[in-house]
């Protein structure tokens, strides 16, 4: 009787373990599918997956925790981050930011729970396929356009008197979206002493103009009454996908583009339907990245692609790509000049000059006290103390962060934390280089021509390495480590490669 009860209990535990393990895998795929689109959905998948993983430890057999070369650096960096939070000028604010810092557990959720190399490959392809959805969305937005772009304006126009100029795209009036000039007329003819609030887009800015009502010109159609000489749909804004900001979108695209390039370089038969699909994805991601008009991410993409080609492609392929890149770079520079009215390296650009200002202020604050060098000022404590520290040109510049991973980490968490972060990236790069070599030198060529063959493993590693280097390069002028959407994709790639290393090492040990 006891044996039967014990057997029944073992069966129930076995079924529960299988259910939990499968549910964790589902969460991993939901994470990969949501990462290019929604921070809320991605973090929900992460939290549910983490909860299930913790519950899994309550059942026999207890999961084995596999060590990795990055464990000490990851945990040490988080510990130093926590220490800086508790010693912060604003402890409660900084401690609240530890939730974002705990996103590093994404690495372990993937690294410890992926059961096979096939799942690694499917997760990487899920990320790519899902990202194509926001590429189509971005293309659809451009095709449809938005608002009313003013092509010409008479001096006597009530819009001109309010400050509107040719080239502006009118988006909303009194909170209502504009689709055509008739929408303007309908609200400007209403008798009201209060002027209408007209929101517009002008070269990255969203000014609001106060337009007096009842000042329309005489005319037989809306354009004549508004003093507008011509209009079209606006298509000038910077693409942001489903995110709220174009920089987040650009940085995520850079990481996913690196994965795409890595897979294509590793693909044995490039003239195949798989090669065609990867080419389509590559062109789509490039299209969206260009529309973000984000110089640092463009440069990061070029750097990451160069690294991947040097490590994975032959000389002939590198030469061909190099020749193709030149016209693309020139076209990108022209597009940048047309859409943002700046050059790639432009000392007259406001975003460049105020970066230089906050870098100087941040460095001065960092070295002003030994405490700042050791443990930093604490995450987000600057929001409550920028006035007393005279930051952001005493409030005349946009208040936010230091626009550099290196300076931001040193200032908020201390120089030791920055050093450990650099060690983490260095160890990660070394691991990826060794894994690339191991996969290249392995004798496992069986199935290399299959859609889900071993070539994908090498492509993932090449993409992760290139993406990491591009991420670091872009982070010299962006604080992309503080962007959760970007960091989650970065940790996702790190988790995939750690899982792949574990599975490759296990196979090697068996042989």
Question: Predicted regions span which residues?
Answer:
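Transmembrane alpha-helices of multi-pass inner-membrane enzymes
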Residues: 48-54, 258, 302-305, 317-318, ...
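A membrane-periplasm/extracellular boundary helix in multi-pass inner-membrane enzymes
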Residues: 129, 136, 140-146, 283-286, ...
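PDZ/PDZ-like domain segments forming the peptide/carboxylate-binding groove
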Residues: 144-180
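PDZ-domain C-terminal substructure recognizer with occasional recognition of PDZ-binding tails
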Residues: 185-229
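A conserved mid-to-late transmembrane alpha helix and its immediate loop/hinge
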Residues: 240-248, 394-432, 473
């Amino acid at each position: 009787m006891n044996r039967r009860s014990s057997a029944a209990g073992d069966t129930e535990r076995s079924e529960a373990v299988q259910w939990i393990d499968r549910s964790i895998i589902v969460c991993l795929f939901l994470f990969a599918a949501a990462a290019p689109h929604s921070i809320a959905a991605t973090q929900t998948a992460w939290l549910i997956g983490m909860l299930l993983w913790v519950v899994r430890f309550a059942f026999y057999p207890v999961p084995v925790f596999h060590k990795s070369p990055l464990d000490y650096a990851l945990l040490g960096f988080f510990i130093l981050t926590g220490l800086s939070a508790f010693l912060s000028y604003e402890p409660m604010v900084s401690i609240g930011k530890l939730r974002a810092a705990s996103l590093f557990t994404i690495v372990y959720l993937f690294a410890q729970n992926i059961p096979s190399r096939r799942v690694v490959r499917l997760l990487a392809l899920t990320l790519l396929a899902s990202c194509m959805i926001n590429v189509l969305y971005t293309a659809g937005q451009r095709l449809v356009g938005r608002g009313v772009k003013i092509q010409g304006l008479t001096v006597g126009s009530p819009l001109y008197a309010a400050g509107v100029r040719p080239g502006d795209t009118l988006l909303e009036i009194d909170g209502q979206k504009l689709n055509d000039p008739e929408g303007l007329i309908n609200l400007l003819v209403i008798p009201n002493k209060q002027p209408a609030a007209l929101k517009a887009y002008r070269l990255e800015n969203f000014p609001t103009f106060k337009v007096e009502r009842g000042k329309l010109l005489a005319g037989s159609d809306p354009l004549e009454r508004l003093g507008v000489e011509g209009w079209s749909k606006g298509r000038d804004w910077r693409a942001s996908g489903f995110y709220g900001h174009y920089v987040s979108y650009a940085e995520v695209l850079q990481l996913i583009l690196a994965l795409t390039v890595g897979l294509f370089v590793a693909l044995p038969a490039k003239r195949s339907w798989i090669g065609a699909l990867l080419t389509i994805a590559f062109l789509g991601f490039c299209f969206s990245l260009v529309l973000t008009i984000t110089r640092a991410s463009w440069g990061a993409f070029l750097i990451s692609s160069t690294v991947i080609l040097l490590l994975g492609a032959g000389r002939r392929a590198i030469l061909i790509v190099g020749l193709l890149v030149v016209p693309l770079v020139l076209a990108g520079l022209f597009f940048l000049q047309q859409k943002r009215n700046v050059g790639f390296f432009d000392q007259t650009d406001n975003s460049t000059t105020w970066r230089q200002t906050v870098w100087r202020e941040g460095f001065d604050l960092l070295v002003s006290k030994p405490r700042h060098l050791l443990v930093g000022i604490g995450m987000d404590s600057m929001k409550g103390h920028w006035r007393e520290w005279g930051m952001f040109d005493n409030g005349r510049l946009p208040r936010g962060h230091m626009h550099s991973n290196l300076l931001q980490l040193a200032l908020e968490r201390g120089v030791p934390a920055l050093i450990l972060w650099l060690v983490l990236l260095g160890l990660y790069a070394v691991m990826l280089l060794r894994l690339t070599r191991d996969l290249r030198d392995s004798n496992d060529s069986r199935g290399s021509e299959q859609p889900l063959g071993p070539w994908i493993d090498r492509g993932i590693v090449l993409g992760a390495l290139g993406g990491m280097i591009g991420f670091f390069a872009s982070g010299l002028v962006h604080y992309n480590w503080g962007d959760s959407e970007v960091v989650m994709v970065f940790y996702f790639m790190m988790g995939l490669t750690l899982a792949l290393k574990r599975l490759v090492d296990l196979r090697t040990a068996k042989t």
